[in-house]
Amino acid sequence: KNNKLEDIYSIRTCLDVESNSRSKSKIWHLHGDIDRAKSISLGLNHYCGTIGKMDGYFKGTYEYTLNGKKVKLDALSKKLRGEVQHDGISWIELFFTTNIHIVGLSLDYSETDLWWLLNRRARPLNFNTNDIINEIIYYDTEIDETKASDKKQLLEAFNVKYIHIPIDNEKWDKAYMRIFDMIEHSKKSK
């Protein structure tokens, strides 16, 4: 089920999926989806607009309209300190509260919104990083070892676990099945 809550940005929009075991998950297309063509992040203007929305989410100035009524969310910092409940309205919160597995995303340096968020999460000035107990894992299928090494160093500086699964002879499907198996195994071991 797709809850298409926004036209341009993808702060609150997700896809609710149910697996064979009846467990429910949400898939967040952070940079838009084909069903909402205007939501696809193309260009600096869109990425910077997303950063503005994320900054508002942090500060408690993020607002939206639901059923004709304005809704204003509490600051993320208050949620992280336990002053108010997490509402699960956005994927932004999840970067601080639950394990995240990033798959199928090049995480190119032009994706300034995600780099901004990872930087914000890693900065001890904004939060007591000891309170952030979740793990972010990035699975990289980059073939170029130099690019992979550079990205690994930067991600690790942002407290992101980096796992390199190179695509062998362009057999991307096997690489992704291996990644999905690793994710499934990590869920069972907790």
PLM features: what roles do these ranges have?
Residues 1-3, 15-23, 82-190:
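SIR2/sirtuin-family catalytic core signature
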Residues 1-61, 99:
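Extended, H/D-rich, highly charged conserved domains that either
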Residues 9, 47, 57, 62-64, ...:
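Sequence-level detector for tyrosine residue identity
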Residues 12, 31, 50, 60-61, ...:
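Generic signature of intrinsically disordered, low-complexity segments enriched in small/polar residues
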Residues 35, 59, 63, 67, ...:
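Generic surface-pattern signal
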Residues 48-95:
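Acidic, metal/cofactor-coordinating or nucleic-acid-engaging core segments within structured domains
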